[in-house]
Amino acid sequence: MRTLFIADLHLSEKHPQISHAFFEFLQNETENVDALYILGDLFEVWIGDDERTLLMNEVALKLSEYALKNNILLYYIHGNRDFMIGKKYAKQSSMQLLPEHCEINLYGKKILILHGDTLCLADKNYQKMRTLLHNPLIQLVFNLLPLFLRKKIGWKIRHASQSKKVYKNREVMDVTKDEVVRLMEKHHVQTLIHGHTHRVACHEMLVKGQAAQRYDVGDWRHNLSYVEVQKDKINLVIRPINFYN
Protein backbone atom coordinates (compact mmCIF):
# COMPACT_ATOMS: atom_id res chain seq x y z
CA MET A 1 0.00 0.00 0.00
CA ARG A 2 1.10 3.59 -0.58
CA THR A 3 0.11 7.19 0.10
CA LEU A 4 0.84 10.03 -2.34
CA PHE A 5 1.63 13.73 -1.81
CA ILE A 6 1.48 16.50 -4.42
CA ALA A 7 1.50 20.31 -4.34
CA ASP A 8 1.84 23.46 -6.42
CA LEU A 9 0.14 22.49 -9.65
CA HIS A 10 -1.22 26.05 -9.97
CA LEU A 11 -3.99 24.89 -12.28
CA SER A 12 -5.40 27.53 -14.61
CA GLU A 13 -6.88 27.84 -18.08
CA LYS A 14 -3.57 29.36 -19.22
CA HIS A 15 -1.70 26.07 -18.77
CA PRO A 16 -3.92 23.25 -20.06
CA GLN A 17 -0.99 20.84 -20.27
CA ILE A 18 -0.72 20.81 -16.47
CA SER A 19 -4.44 20.17 -16.04
CA HIS A 20 -4.20 17.34 -18.56
CA ALA A 21 -1.21 15.85 -16.73
CA PHE A 22 -3.11 16.03 -13.43
CA PHE A 23 -6.15 14.27 -14.85
CA GLU A 24 -3.91 11.57 -16.33
CA PHE A 25 -2.21 11.22 -12.94
CA LEU A 26 -5.59 10.62 -11.30
CA GLN A 27 -6.48 8.12 -13.99
CA ASN A 28 -3.29 6.10 -13.63
CA GLU A 29 -2.14 6.38 -10.00
CA THR A 30 -4.81 4.21 -8.40
CA GLU A 31 -3.18 0.85 -7.70
CA ASN A 32 -2.63 0.19 -3.98
CA VAL A 33 -3.19 3.88 -3.13
CA ASP A 34 -4.68 4.51 0.31
CA ALA A 35 -4.78 8.30 0.16
CA LEU A 36 -3.76 11.38 -1.79
CA TYR A 37 -2.67 14.49 0.09
CA ILE A 38 -2.68 17.80 -1.80
CA LEU A 39 -0.41 20.23 0.04
CA GLY A 40 -1.76 23.48 -1.33
CA ASP A 41 -1.78 25.65 -4.45
CA LEU A 42 -3.70 23.17 -6.54
CA PHE A 43 -5.08 26.27 -8.27
CA GLU A 44 -3.29 29.40 -9.40
CA VAL A 45 -5.84 31.51 -7.58
CA TRP A 46 -9.01 31.03 -5.54
CA ILE A 47 -11.19 33.96 -4.52
CA GLY A 48 -14.15 32.05 -3.13
CA ASP A 49 -16.25 28.93 -3.53
CA ASP A 50 -18.87 30.94 -5.42
CA GLU A 51 -16.55 31.41 -8.41
CA ARG A 52 -16.80 28.32 -10.58
CA THR A 53 -14.98 28.09 -13.88
CA LEU A 54 -15.27 25.05 -16.13
CA LEU A 55 -11.82 23.97 -14.94
CA MET A 56 -12.74 24.25 -11.26
CA ASN A 57 -15.84 22.13 -11.80
CA GLU A 58 -13.91 19.57 -13.85
CA VAL A 59 -11.24 19.27 -11.16
CA ALA A 60 -13.91 18.72 -8.50
CA LEU A 61 -15.52 16.01 -10.63
CA LYS A 62 -12.22 14.24 -11.37
CA LEU A 63 -11.16 14.31 -7.73
CA SER A 64 -14.48 12.98 -6.52
CA GLU A 65 -14.42 10.18 -9.10
CA TYR A 66 -10.85 9.34 -8.11
CA ALA A 67 -11.82 9.07 -4.46
CA LEU A 68 -15.14 7.27 -4.76
CA LYS A 69 -14.39 4.84 -7.59
CA ASN A 70 -11.07 3.74 -6.13
CA ASN A 71 -11.86 4.03 -2.40
CA ILE A 72 -9.02 6.54 -1.98
CA LEU A 73 -9.07 9.18 0.77
CA LEU A 74 -8.40 12.78 -0.28
CA TYR A 75 -6.92 15.43 2.02
CA TYR A 76 -6.15 19.09 1.40
CA ILE A 77 -3.94 21.69 3.08
CA HIS A 78 -4.41 25.26 1.90
CA GLY A 79 -1.63 26.97 -0.04
CA ASN A 80 -0.82 30.64 -0.34
CA ARG A 81 -2.75 30.92 -3.63
CA ASP A 82 -5.89 28.99 -2.71
CA PHE A 83 -6.29 29.46 1.04
CA MET A 84 -9.88 30.59 0.43
CA ILE A 85 -11.02 27.13 -0.70
CA GLY A 86 -13.92 26.39 1.60
CA LYS A 87 -15.91 23.45 2.90
CA LYS A 88 -18.38 23.66 0.01
CA TYR A 89 -15.80 23.01 -2.70
CA ALA A 90 -13.95 20.50 -0.54
CA LYS A 91 -17.16 18.50 -0.11
CA GLN A 92 -17.89 18.62 -3.84
CA SER A 93 -14.37 17.30 -4.47
CA SER A 94 -14.59 14.61 -1.75
CA MET A 95 -11.67 16.23 0.06
CA GLN A 96 -11.14 16.67 3.78
CA LEU A 97 -9.56 19.99 4.77
CA LEU A 98 -6.63 19.77 7.18
CA PRO A 99 -4.95 22.37 9.44
CA GLU A 100 -1.91 24.24 8.09
CA HIS A 101 0.50 22.05 10.13
CA CYS A 102 -0.72 18.48 10.37
CA GLU A 103 0.79 15.40 12.00
CA ILE A 104 -0.15 12.11 10.39
CA ASN A 105 0.79 8.50 11.06
CA LEU A 106 1.44 6.39 7.98
CA TYR A 107 2.31 2.73 8.26
CA GLY A 108 3.77 3.29 11.73
CA LYS A 109 5.73 6.40 10.73
CA LYS A 110 4.92 9.84 12.14
CA ILE A 111 5.12 12.59 9.51
CA LEU A 112 4.55 16.35 9.58
CA ILE A 113 2.92 17.83 6.47
CA LEU A 114 2.29 21.47 5.51
CA HIS A 115 2.19 23.74 2.49
CA GLY A 116 5.56 25.25 3.33
CA ASP A 117 5.11 29.01 3.21
CA THR A 118 5.26 29.24 7.00
CA LEU A 119 8.84 27.91 6.78
CA CYS A 120 10.10 30.86 4.71
CA LEU A 121 10.76 33.29 7.55
CA ALA A 122 13.43 35.26 5.67
CA ASP A 123 10.72 36.61 3.38
CA LYS A 124 9.49 39.06 5.99
CA ASN A 125 7.24 41.06 3.64
CA TYR A 126 5.43 37.92 2.59
CA GLN A 127 4.98 36.80 6.21
CA LYS A 128 3.41 40.16 7.07
CA MET A 129 1.04 39.87 4.13
CA ARG A 130 0.22 36.28 5.06
CA THR A 131 -0.71 37.28 8.61
CA LEU A 132 -3.03 39.96 7.23
CA LEU A 133 -4.70 37.72 4.63
CA HIS A 134 -5.26 34.89 7.11
CA ASN A 135 -6.99 37.14 9.61
CA PRO A 136 -10.53 35.70 9.99
CA LEU A 137 -12.07 39.19 10.05
CA ILE A 138 -10.29 40.18 6.83
CA GLN A 139 -11.46 36.97 5.16
CA LEU A 140 -15.04 37.55 6.33
CA VAL A 141 -15.09 41.06 4.87
CA PHE A 142 -13.45 39.84 1.65
CA ASN A 143 -16.09 37.14 1.17
CA LEU A 144 -18.83 39.74 1.51
CA LEU A 145 -17.49 41.71 -1.45
CA PRO A 146 -18.99 41.23 -4.93
CA LEU A 147 -17.25 38.62 -7.07
CA PHE A 148 -15.97 41.14 -9.63
CA LEU A 149 -14.33 43.19 -6.89
CA ARG A 150 -12.70 40.11 -5.33
CA LYS A 151 -11.32 39.19 -8.75
CA LYS A 152 -9.80 42.65 -9.12
CA ILE A 153 -8.24 42.53 -5.65
CA GLY A 154 -6.92 39.02 -6.26
CA TRP A 155 -5.32 40.10 -9.54
CA LYS A 156 -3.62 43.09 -7.87
CA ILE A 157 -2.23 40.93 -5.06
CA ARG A 158 -0.86 38.35 -7.53
CA HIS A 159 0.64 41.04 -9.75
CA ALA A 160 2.35 42.70 -6.79
CA SER A 161 3.66 39.33 -5.59
CA GLN A 162 5.08 38.42 -9.01
CA SER A 163 6.74 41.83 -9.34
CA LYS A 164 8.47 41.52 -5.97
CA LYS A 165 9.78 38.02 -6.79
CA VAL A 166 12.03 39.51 -9.47
CA TYR A 167 14.02 41.34 -6.80
CA LYS A 168 14.17 38.56 -4.21
CA ASN A 169 17.17 36.23 -4.05
CA ARG A 170 16.80 32.47 -3.82
CA GLU A 171 17.73 32.35 -0.14
CA VAL A 172 14.92 34.71 0.85
CA MET A 173 12.33 32.58 -0.95
CA ASP A 174 13.64 29.28 0.42
CA VAL A 175 12.82 27.68 3.76
CA THR A 176 14.59 28.84 6.90
CA LYS A 177 16.53 25.79 8.07
CA ASP A 178 16.35 26.70 11.76
CA GLU A 179 12.57 26.96 11.49
CA VAL A 180 12.41 23.53 9.85
CA VAL A 181 14.36 22.00 12.73
CA ARG A 182 12.34 23.89 15.34
CA LEU A 183 9.06 22.70 13.88
CA MET A 184 10.20 19.10 13.56
CA GLU A 185 11.43 19.11 17.15
CA LYS A 186 8.16 20.64 18.32
CA HIS A 187 6.13 17.88 16.63
CA HIS A 188 8.63 15.13 17.45
CA VAL A 189 9.02 13.95 13.85
CA GLN A 190 11.94 12.86 11.69
CA THR A 191 10.09 13.32 8.40
CA LEU A 192 8.58 16.50 6.97
CA ILE A 193 6.81 16.84 3.60
CA HIS A 194 5.95 20.22 2.09
CA GLY A 195 5.58 22.26 -1.08
CA HIS A 196 5.58 26.01 -1.83
CA THR A 197 9.23 26.59 -2.82
CA HIS A 198 9.01 24.70 -6.15
CA ARG A 199 12.43 23.15 -5.42
CA VAL A 200 11.85 19.43 -5.63
CA ALA A 201 14.37 17.59 -3.45
CA CYS A 202 14.98 15.34 -0.49
CA HIS A 203 17.11 17.03 2.17
CA GLU A 204 18.99 14.93 4.71
CA MET A 205 19.43 16.57 8.10
CA LEU A 206 19.78 16.01 11.82
CA VAL A 207 16.97 16.60 14.31
CA LYS A 208 17.86 16.06 17.96
CA GLY A 209 20.95 14.19 16.83
CA GLN A 210 19.00 11.72 14.70
CA ALA A 211 18.82 11.36 10.93
CA ALA A 212 15.81 13.17 9.46
CA GLN A 213 14.45 14.01 6.03
CA ARG A 214 12.66 17.00 4.54
CA TYR A 215 10.86 16.34 1.24
CA ASP A 216 9.93 19.23 -1.06
CA VAL A 217 7.41 17.75 -3.49
CA GLY A 218 8.08 20.37 -6.17
CA ASP A 219 5.77 22.00 -8.71
CA TRP A 220 4.45 20.81 -12.08
CA ARG A 221 5.68 23.52 -14.45
CA HIS A 222 8.10 21.30 -16.36
CA ASN A 223 7.86 17.88 -14.70
CA LEU A 224 5.29 16.16 -12.52
CA SER A 225 6.56 15.15 -9.11
CA TYR A 226 5.17 13.56 -5.98
CA VAL A 227 6.22 11.88 -2.76
CA GLU A 228 5.18 8.27 -2.28
CA VAL A 229 5.16 6.83 1.24
CA GLN A 230 5.14 3.06 1.66
CA LYS A 231 5.53 0.89 4.74
CA ASP A 232 9.28 0.46 4.41
CA LYS A 233 10.39 3.44 2.29
CA ILE A 234 9.66 6.93 0.99
CA ASN A 235 10.19 7.76 -2.68
CA LEU A 236 10.48 11.14 -4.37
CA VAL A 237 9.17 10.57 -7.89
CA ILE A 238 9.96 12.95 -10.78
CA ARG A 239 8.59 12.29 -14.25
CA PRO A 240 8.11 14.18 -17.54
CA ILE A 241 4.91 16.21 -17.59
CA ASN A 242 3.61 14.02 -20.45
CA PHE A 243 4.58 10.74 -18.75
CA TYR A 244 1.09 9.20 -18.86
CA ASN A 245 0.36 10.10 -22.49
Curated annotation (Swiss-Prot):
What are the binding positions for Mn(2+) 1 in this chain? D8, H10, D41, H198
List of residues binding substrate = N80, R81, D123, S161, K165, K168, H196
**Where, if anywhere, are coiled coils annotated?**
none
Q: What is a single molecular function from GO for this protein?
A: manganese ion binding
The GO annotation for biological process reads: lipid A biosynthetic process
Which EC number(s) does UniProt give? Answer: 3.6.1.54
Aminoacyl-tRNA synthetase found in the keyword field: no
Binding positions for Mn(2+) 2 per the UniProt entry? D41, N80, H115, H196
What InterPro entries does this protein map onto? Calcineurin-like_PHP_ApaH (IPR004843), LpxH-like (IPR043461), Metallo-depent_PP-like (IPR029052), UDP-diacylglucosamine_Hdrlase (IPR010138)
Protein name according to UniProt = UDP-2,3-diacylglucosamine hydrolase
